[in-house]
Amino acid sequence: MRRGRKVPRLRVLSGRQVCKIMAEHGFEQVRQKGSHLIMQKRIGNTTVTVPVPDHDELRMGTLLGIIRQSGLPRSLFETE
């Protein structure tokens, strides 16, 4: 068995909590379509658009997709 650093786990977050973290890092909510909040951030000539489901608990795969699309560091969404 290998021993090494323990990888921090992602927190269980709601869609609103994820939007709050994203807003603290330059994203803004531009609209809502159904149960999805649409977050955007302008980076140079590019606009990054990330839909975030407004659910009480986001599934880990969904959260990982949001992290990947947003370009934010995973550490913002991990347990402390």
Model regions and ranges:
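Basic nucleic-acid-binding interfaces
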Residues: 1-32, 38-80
